[in-house]
Each structure stands twice: as structure tokens, then as C-alpha cells.
């Protein structure tokens, strides 16, 4: 019986409180009741927290899309995460492409020019795939996880305290209203007492909320650090991939000898005259493409500002005293000069020095 | 009407003959003309080229556009012969969000300022990615697709014709064999029937009849053989064209490698620029934050400086790990401003020179540093006034 009474009493009290809040809220909306305004500073903090939450969420989602553009894979990872199971390590796109290229090269014949190039390219794609995987893991660990922790941890706490603050304020305003309406001295005294209690609770809750909101500044500092980590991970990724591509281009740069070998192999088979003509132009175009590939390496040369050895491909007569005459097959030292036409380098042979055209050279390491 | 009917009947007859020949081959009841070994090799090579080209094409498409929905969309646009609308890349979208976040959170705060810088870099990365996708599609995917939809279709068609010619040829051979067998059988009959005049006449007629049949079959065989040989020659020429296809695809592969190198070079440069900006704003970050933030926030922020410093330093070890000494120097030079080749560096800790080739250092001083080709990647040449010597990279904070 006592238990029954206790429960009923508590239930009635809660219902009363709820009703009071509802009445207060309604009267506020209808403009029939006064509302305690939060101070400007607290309002600013609330606005800032809201803003931080929204944009953190957007940035996090878009970074996830950036790292894993395939929505099916993202859904799969999400499901695994919810099931608290470890996601199986998946071969990523560059690794799969690399595998196909290597297999294709093996089948076409590693001794052929195309097969050889495919195998080298495939190996590089695999390395890029590994770097890609590392970027995803590092970014997820250092950037995405902290952002997610903020949204699911700190911000949830802030939201909860904020709700409590709202309730305290409604209680406070309800008490104020009740005091205003009180007539009898005894009722007035009771209302004043109640007002002091609700005011005290409100102030305490406001203080707690303010402290939490001011923590947003340290959240920004933390996210700033995470952003730097993300930048670092991306930096590492692109530096590695760039290095891989440079290595690959150097390997492919030895193409002429491979092509010659392939040509010999092809000529071993009886080839009709018309077909020989068909291969000829392609070969020339291929050679032209190789020459075009050199400027990319030359850009590295310009940036490095280092001396390099170069072999001359064709004879060249200097057009004026600023140029250096060249003989086919000789080796000279070349370097770039800032502000000079990108089609030229400075060449040195012994104590002779002058401009040399890039297209006449084959850069050596 | 007669013409069409005759042609239809003729085609039906041919089809039926081929079907019979094919079936008998499968049951092992008929001989089959074998193609020569060289020809078989060419066929296998063509099949192999087609299969792998298709796989590489598909996987490169996946590499360039990992989102299957976007690929389906592009496919539809292509089929409808309409221009694909230019889509904002994921990097560009992230950049946009970061820029807007910075505006809302306060462009003058440390976090906001960094977000703006990072968003600009991400936008450039996104643009570089778009260029890469476009260039790779144009110079690598399109030629592969043209081969599959052009050359390969032609080869397939000629192969099918060759198959039909071979079936016709083998059908003629089978028919000739039967005719000869019948003729032989007919010529042996008179031995038993000579004594009867009527049978003799019939026997002679049969023999003559089969003889005509044999002649006709031989004629048809010659025609079929000629057509088969001609078709085989045409097909062989097409198959040998695979060599020039390989050369063409090799050139396209080079173009792909080139565009990918350009892409990563651009991205790498953008990241270098970004790190320089973030590094240079490091000094600005601390005072601004200190003024604007309450006391409890200071401790977490103070750890930002070491992180930023660490973010700058790993560039060097990365280069060292990846490349031989010569290339390590080259990679290190990537970090240096191209104009001068030398950089300013601040010393982090005191360092005593171990020998005359090294330079002693004092914490917080500024020196000029540069790298030499072939030198250990953990060292640089440092200069202070007229003093010069080797200095360890780990003791320095490189400035831009």
C-alpha cells in the first residue's frame, strides 16, 4: 500500500511538472507569458556549437566519400561496423588494375614491348593501390574518427545539457508566473521559495552548459590538429605516388631497346609488305611519343637545378654564339637556368658552354 | 517470287549442310581440316589480346570513376549521344564544404584559417583529378574501346566466315569421299553380272552416273578449297594486325602513364604549397588562439606546434625511404624552392660537430642549407656566415 501510494504520488508530481512546462511553453508561444532570455554570450556559444556540429558532419561525410567513392563499399563498411565485425581487407581498384595488367603482360609475352610495359605499369599500379589503402586507413584513424567521436560524444552531451537547460528555464518562468498570480500572503511566500529554488537550479544548469559550450574552442583546436594530420597523410600519399610514377617513367624510358627487340622478333615472322607499312607509322608515332615523354622528366631537372648527363641523339649546328654545337652520340653535361625558354637547356662540353635544344637530347641519370 | 524462293531454298540447303557437317565433327564421324600451327597461334593471341584489353579497360574505368552509379549515368549519356554534364569531383565538393565551414566558424580563427587553406588545396586536387580522368579517358580508354568495337568486331566476323568456309570445304570432302566409294562399288558389280545383257547395260549406266557425280564433287571441292584459302589469308592478315594493335596500345599506355604522372606531380606540388602555408601560419596560430581562448584550451593547442613541425619534417624521410641516394637528393630538391636551391632553416637543438666536415649548431639560430647530389639523405650542407659544413636534417626546421 505504501509502495502504491509512493508511485502514485511520484506519478502525479511528474504529471504536474510536465503540465506546468507545457502550459508555460504554450503561453510563451502565444505571447501571453514572459520568457527569461539567455545572455548574449551564452546564445553565441550555442550558435557556435550548432554550427560546428553541422559542418563537422558535412566535412566528415564528404571526406568519407572522397576516400571511398563507391557507395556500395561504404554501406558494406557501415554494416560491418554496426555488427562490430572486422571488415575484410578488400583489393582496391588500383591493385586490381595492377593485377590485370601484370597477368595481361605475362600472357602477351614479357619479352615483347607491350607485355613488358604492362608488367611494369601493373607493378606500379599495385604500389599506388597500397599507398591508397594506407591513406584511407591513416585518414580514417587520424581525421574521421575524432570527428565522429565529437559528433557522437561531446555534442550529444551538449545537446542533453541544453535540453535540461530548456526545462529548467521553463520551470523558472512557470514559477515566476505563479508568483505574479499569487494573492494570499501564505501562497506568496511559498511561491517565492519555489522561485528561489528554480532560479538556483537554472543558474547551475546554465553554468554547466556554458562550460561545455566553451569546450568547443578546444574542440576546434583538436580538429585543427586532426586536419593537419589529414594533410600530412595526403602529402605522404601523393609524394609516394609521384615517386612511383617517376620510377615507372624511367623504366619505360628504356623503351627503344625493347622495341628494337620486339621488332626483331616480329620480323622473324613473314609479314606482308602492306602490314610492314602499317607497323612503320605506328612505330614512328611511338618513338615520337617517347620523345614527348622526355619533357616531363626535364621538368624534374629544372626543379632540381642539378647537373645531369645527357646523350645527344642528332647532330646540331649552333645558330649563334649562345648555342653549343652537338655531335650525335656524344655525352654532355646539362642543367637548367631559371627564366630560360623551357625548350632549351644549358649544355657543357669541357670548357665550352651554350644553349642546347631539349628535343635533341636523351637525359641520363 | 521464284528468285527469292530459290535463294531461300539454297540458303536453307547450305545451312543444313553446315549443320550436318558440324554435328558429325562433334560425334567424331567426320574429318576436320586442321588449321596450321602458326594460324592457331595467331588466333590464340588475338583472343588473349581481346580478353585482357577488355578487362584492363573495365578496371581502368572503375579506377577513374569508382562510383558505379556515376558510371551507369555516363554510359546512358553516351548511348543517348548527349554530352555528359561536368560533375563536381569529390575533392572539389569537400573543398566547398570546408570553405563554407570556415566562413561559418570564423575565417579569422586558427581552425577557420586552416580550413580555408586546406579547402583551396583540395579544390586544386579535385581539378587535377578531373583533368586526369579526362585525359586518361581520351588517350587510353577511347583507343582500347575503339579496338574492341572496331578491329575486334571485324576479326570476329572474318573468323566466323572462315569457320563457315571450312565447314563447306569439309562437307565437300565428305561428299567426294562418298561419291568415290559409290563409284568403286559400282565398277565391281559388272564382274558378277556380265553374262546378262540387260544387267550389263544397267551396270554401265550406273558406273557412268557415279563417274559424273565424282567429277562434280571434285569441282565443288576445288571451288570450296579456293574460297577457304582466300578467307584464311584474309583472316590471317587481320590477325597479324594484332602486332600493330599492341604497338598502338603500348603508345596509349605511355600516354596513360604520362597523364597519371602529371596528376600526381600536380597533387604533390599542391600539397607542398599547402604545407608551406600551414607551416608559415604556425606562428600566427598560437598567439591568436591564446588570446581568443580560455585557459583550459591552451594545453591541447600547444601540442599543435609539434604536430605541424612533424608534418613538415616527414617529407624528407619519405623521400629517403623511397629513392636511391641520387634520387633521394632529387626528391629532397623537390622541397627546395626552384629559384635559388638554398633554404633557410632554424636549428631546433644544439649540435656539436663530430669532425671538421660538420658544422656545430646552436639552438634557435638561423642558417642557410642546401643539398648535394649523392650525399647521405640524412644530411644537408649548412652555412653560417663563411663557415660551412654538414648538418643533420633532424636537428633542423626548414623554413620557406
Curated annotation (Swiss-Prot), chain A:
GO terms for molecular function: fatty acid binding; lysophosphatidic acid acyltransferase activity; phosphatidylinositol 3-kinase activator activity; protein homodimerization activity. InterPro entries: AH/BAR_dom_sf, BAR_dom, Endophilin_SH3RF, SH3-like_dom_sf, SH3_domain, SH3GLB1_BAR, SH3GLB_SH3. Residues 1-30 are annotated as: Membrane-binding amphipathic helix. Phosphorylated at Thr-145 by CDK5; this phosphorylation is required for autophagy induction in starved neurons and facilitates homodimerization. SMART domains: BAR (SM00721), SH3 (SM00326). Residues 305-365 form the SH3 domain. The modification N-acetylmethionine is found at residue 1. One of its GO terms (biological process) is cellular response to glucose starvation. Belongs to the endophilin family. An N-terminal amphipathic helix, the BAR domain and a second amphipathic helix inserted into helix 1 of the BAR domain (N-BAR domain) induce membrane curvature and bind curved membranes. This is Endophilin-B1. The lineage of its organism: Eukaryota, Metazoa, Chordata, Craniata, Vertebrata.
Curated annotation (Swiss-Prot), chain B:
Residues 24-287 form the BAR domain. Signal peptide: none annotated. Residues 340-400 form the SH3 domain. Its main location: cytoplasm. The modification Phosphoserine is found at residues 10, 400. Pfam families: BAR, SH3_9. The modification N-acetylmethionine is found at residue 1. Residues 205-234 form a coiled coil. InterPro entries: AH/BAR_dom_sf, BAR_dom, Endophilin_B2_SH3, Endophilin_SH3RF, SH3-like_dom_sf, SH3_domain. One of its GO terms (cellular component) is cytoplasm. Residues 1-27 are annotated as: Membrane-binding amphipathic helix. It is found in: Cytoplasm. Keywords: Acetylation, Coiled coil, Cytoplasm, Phosphoprotein, SH3 domain. Belongs to the endophilin family. Homodimer, and heterodimer with SH3GLB1. PANTHER family: DREBRIN-LIKE PROTEIN-RELATED (PTHR14167:SF68), SH3 DOMAIN-CONTAINING (PTHR14167). This is Endophilin-B2. It comes from Mus musculus.
Amino acid at each position: 500500500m505504501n509502495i502504491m501510494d509512493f508511485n502514485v504520488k511520484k506519478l502525479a508530481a511528474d504529471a504536474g511538472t510536465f503540465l506546468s512546462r507545457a502550459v508555460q511553453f504554450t503561453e510563451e508561444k502565444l505571447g501571453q507569458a514572459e520568457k527569461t532570455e539567455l545572455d548574449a554570450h551564452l546564445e553565441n556559444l550555442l550558435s557556435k556549437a550548432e554550427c560546428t556540429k553541422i559542418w563537422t558532419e558535412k566535412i566528415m561525410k564528404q571526406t568519407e566519400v572522397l576516400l571511398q567513392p563507391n557507395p556500395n563499399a561504404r554501406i558494406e563498411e557501415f554494416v560491418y561496423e554496426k555488427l562490430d565485425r572486422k571488415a575484410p581487407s578488400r583489393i582496391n581498384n588500383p591493385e586490381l588494375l595492377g593485377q590485370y595488367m601484370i597477368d595481361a603482360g605475362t600472357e602477351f609475352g614479357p619479352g615483347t614491348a607491350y607485355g613488358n610495359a604492362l608488367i611494369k605499369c601493373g607493378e606500379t599500379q599495385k604500389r599506388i593501390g597500397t599507398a591508397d589503402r594506407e591513406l584511407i586507413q591513416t585518414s580514417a584513424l587520424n581525421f574521421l574518427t575524432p570527428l565522429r567521436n565529437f559528433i557522437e560524444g561531446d555534442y550529444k552531451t551538449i545537446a542533453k545539457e541544453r535540453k535540461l537547460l530548456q526545462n529548467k528555464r521553463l520551470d523558472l518562468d512557470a514559477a515566476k508566473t505563479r508568483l505574479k498570480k499569487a494573492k494570499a500572503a501564505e501562497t506568496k511566500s511559498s511561491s517565492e521559495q519555489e522561485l528561489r529554488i528554480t532560479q538556483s537550479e537554472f543558474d547551475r544548469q546554465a553554468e554547466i552548459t556554458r562550460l561545455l559550450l566553451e569546450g568547443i574552442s578546444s574542440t576546434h583546436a583538436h580538429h585543427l590538429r586532426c586536419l593537419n594530420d589529414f594533410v600530412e597523410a595526403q602529402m605522404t600519399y601523393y609524394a609516394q605516388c609521384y615517386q612511383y610514377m617517376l620510377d615507372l617513367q624511367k623504366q619505360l624510358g628504356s623503351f627503344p631497346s625493347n622495341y628494337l627487340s620486339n621488332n626483331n622478333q616480329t620480323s622473324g615472322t613473314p609479314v606482308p609488305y602492306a602490314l610492314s607499312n602499317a607497323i612503320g607509322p605506328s612505330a614512328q608515332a611511338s618513338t615520337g611519343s617517347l620523345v614527348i615523354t622526355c619533357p616531363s622528366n626535364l621538368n624534374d631537372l629544372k626543379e632540381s637545378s642539378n647537373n645531369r648527363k645527357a646523350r645527344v641523339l642528332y647532330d646540331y649546328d649552333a645558330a649563334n654564339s649562345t648555342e653549343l654545337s652537338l655531335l650525335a652520340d656524344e655525352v654532355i653535361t646539362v642543367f637548367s637556368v631559371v627564366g630560360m625558354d623551357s625548350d632549351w637547356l644549358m649544355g657543357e662540353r669541357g670548357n665550352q658552354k651554350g644553349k642546347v635544344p631539349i628535343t635533341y637530347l636523351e637525359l641520363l641519370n | 517470287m521464284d528468285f527469292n524462293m530459290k535463294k531461300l531454298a539454297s540458303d536453307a540447303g547450305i545451312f543444313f549442310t553446315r549443320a550436318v557437317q558440324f554435328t558429325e565433327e562433334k560425334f567424331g564421324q567426320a574429318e576436320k581440316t586442321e588449321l596450321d600451327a602458326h594460324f592457331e597461334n595467331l588466333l590464340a593471341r588475338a583472343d588473349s589480346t581481346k580478353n585482357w584489353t577488355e578487362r584492363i579497360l573495365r578496371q581502368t574505368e572503375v579506377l577513374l570513376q569508382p562510383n558505379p552509379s556515376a558510371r551507369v549515368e555516363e554510359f546512358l549519356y553516351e548511348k543517348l549521344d548527349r554530352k555528359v554534364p561536368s560533375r563536381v569531383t569529390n575533392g572539389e565538393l569537400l573543398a566547398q564544404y570546408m570553405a563554407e565551414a570556415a566562413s561559418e566558424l570564423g575565417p579569422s580563427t586558427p581552425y577557420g584559417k586552416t580550413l580555408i587553406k586546406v579547402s583551396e588545396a583540395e579544390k586544386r586536387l579535385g581539378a587535377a583529378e578531373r583533368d586526369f580522368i579526362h585525359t586518361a579517358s581520351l588517350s587510353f580508354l577511347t583507343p582500347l574501346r575503339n579496338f574492341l568495337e572496331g578491329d575486334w568486331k571485324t576479326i570476329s566476323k572474318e573468323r566466323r566466315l572462315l569457320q563457315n568456309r571450312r565447314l563447306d570445304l569439309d562437307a565437300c570432302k565428305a561428299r567426294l569421299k562418298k561419291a568415290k566409294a559409290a563409284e568403286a562399288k559400282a565398277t565391281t558389280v559388272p564382274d558378277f553380272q556380265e553374262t546378262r545383257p540387260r544387267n550389263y547395260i544397267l551396270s554401265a549406266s550406273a558406273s557412268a552416273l557415279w563417274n559424273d557425280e565424282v567429277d562434280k564433287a571434285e569441282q565443288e571441292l576445288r571451288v570450296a578449297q579456293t574460297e577457304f584459302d582466300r578467307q584464311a589469308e584474309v583472316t590471317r592478315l587481320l590477325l597479324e594486325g594484332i602486332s600493330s594493335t599492341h604497338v598502338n596500345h603500348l603508345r596509349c599506355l605511355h600516354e596513360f602513364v604520362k597523364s597519371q604522372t602529371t596528376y600526381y606531380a600536380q597533387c604533390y606540388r599542391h600539397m607542398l604549397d599547402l604545407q608551406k602555408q600551414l607551416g608559415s601560419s604556425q606562428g600566427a596560430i598560437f598567439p591568436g588562439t591564446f588570446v581568443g581562448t580560455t585557459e583550459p584550451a591552451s594545453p591541447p593547442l600547444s601540442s599543435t606546434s609539434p604536430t605541424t613541425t612533424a608534418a613538415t619534417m616527414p617529407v624528407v624521410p619519405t623521400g629517403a625511404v623511397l629513392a636511391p641516394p641520387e634520387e633521394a637528393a632529387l626528391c629532397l630538391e623537390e622541397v627546395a624552392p626552384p629559384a635559388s636551391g638554398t633554404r633557410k632553416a632554424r636549428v631546433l637543438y644544439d649540435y656539436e660537430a663530430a669532425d671538421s666536415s660538420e658544422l656545430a649548431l646552436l639552438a634557435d639560430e638561423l642558417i642557410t642549407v642546401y643539398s648535394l647530389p649523392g650525399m647521405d639523405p640524412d644530411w644537408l650542407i649548412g652555412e653560417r656566415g663563411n663557415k660551412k659544413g654538414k648538418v643533420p636534417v633532424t636537428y633542423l626546421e626548414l623554413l620557406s
